[in-house]
């Protein structure tokens, strides 16, 4: 069975893969923005924005969002990579509209209140601390920074404590305007669904998302650094060795 693809008039792309033998649907909103698109003043902002999408809209608080998905019996979450940001949900097939409408409201109508920013700032800083204290994660970051020095690809997706500590309401609004538009979004779904119905629902719930073409990526060629790189990190109570090569 092949997949179906439709590009809406506002530039948004809808892709579906019908699977009539199942009774569930996996739905994802894929934004073409990752940590590689950040400049030196935005380190970690892509990931921070992912967190902020769950912190409330003009009509719903974070608990309302969570309870909405809980009532659907849905799994929902998000993740940020170097290449893209994804918001997703998995649910039984007759809850497609309910899940899609809430995901749309989250990414279109988030309010970015200063109170939510201050709260989530501490959450992300703690996430950075956990990553630094996890050998697997830390080695991966050492590898990236050694392989792509002085380049966005070499920086951690989570950002740094220093940069995360500076983000404001205006930073979030400006980032949202630059990257969260129809031309930068792919709505993809697989499961027991009809493509034409999915397109109709996306048209209905994303009509308020501003039109646009794909945001041009600020691409630069990284200076690849080959060879063996080693680092010894001392932590209490005993030292641990990390190496990337």
Task: Please report, for each region that a protein language model flagged, where it lies by residue.
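M16/insulysin-pitrilysin zinc metalloprotease superfamily fold
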Residues: 56-59, 90-121
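Short loop-to-beta-strand entry elements in the cores of soluble alpha/beta enzymes
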Residues: 183-189
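Single conserved hydrophobic/aromatic residue that forms the stacking wall/gate
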Residues: 234-245
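Active-site SXXK
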Residues: 44-57
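Short beta-strands and strand-coil junctions in structured, solvent-facing domains, enriched
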Residues: 34-37, 195-196
